Amino acid sequence: MSKCILVVEDQEDNRQILRDLLGNAGYELTEAENGEEALAAVAKRRPDLILMDIQLPVMDGYAATRRIRTNPDLKSVPIIAVTSYALAGDEDKALAAGCDGYISKPYSPRDLLAKVRTYLA
């Protein structure tokens, strides 16, 4: 059975890139466009990994991550923060919110797949 990745990303173009990259690598994807949709998605199906954009409408990635981490059934699900706002201290902020890893945009497909595979190994 293929691993399920929840992609939380508000930009359709970025979701399409991830859909192509991760789908071609054999992963099953679920998508959410904001933090609230992410919470609804994890309530329906527990993913094996979450790629969480930080800058999101409605509820940002930090708040969504903190909420996900309050659910005992989801504590072990790896969350990788993905952001284009890679400023000093952002990685620490993402880790403090409960993310397990961090990758900044633009990322190389090879680097992203390597990080995903590391957390799903």
Where are each of the predicted segments found?
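Acidic, metal-coordinating helix/loop segments flanking the phosphotransfer/catalytic sites
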Residues: 6, 31-49, 92
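Conserved acidic carboxylate
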Residues: 9
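Charged docking surfaces used in two-component/phosphorelay signaling
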Residues: 16-24
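Hydrophobic residue at a beta-alpha junction
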Residues: 32-33, 56-59, 68, 89, ...
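The feature encodes the CheY-like receiver
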Residues: 45, 57, 75, 87, ...
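Active-site residues of response regulator receiver
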Residues: 53, 83
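C-terminal output helix
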Residues: 107-116
